[in-house]
């Protein structure tokens, strides 16, 4: 999982896919943080992506850097603890201009039942489960 988080941070931007009814939705994200041994992402409760995750927790992310790409498929679980939100904000200080741990909007999720696949055109895919 550390390798997954490192790749996502180095890529800086990854794309999170959710579903809304029968329509796929994809948008750029930038947060990837390990807290208590789990891979977390962050969003705001007022965003459509939050509503989509709550309706269907199965998501997939994809990132690309230096000719290699990473896909992570799994379920997102909300962690409503203040310390989880604060840990994310501490890891990404620039978010503190828009979010705070106690604003009622900041929301963090961790991956469970996740399968990460590292791929390139020159190597066989490598799969990591967490």
Each predicted region: which residue ranges?
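Charged, amphipathic alpha-helical segments
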Residues: 1-2, 43-47, 93-94
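A short, Trp-centered hydrophobic/proline-enriched beta-strand micro-motif
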Residues: 6-20, 59-61
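Hydrophobic/aromatic beta-strand elements that line small-molecule binding cavities or substrate pockets
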Residues: 29-32, 74-76
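A short mixed-secondary-structure module that forms the rim of ligand-binding clefts
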Residues: 32-66
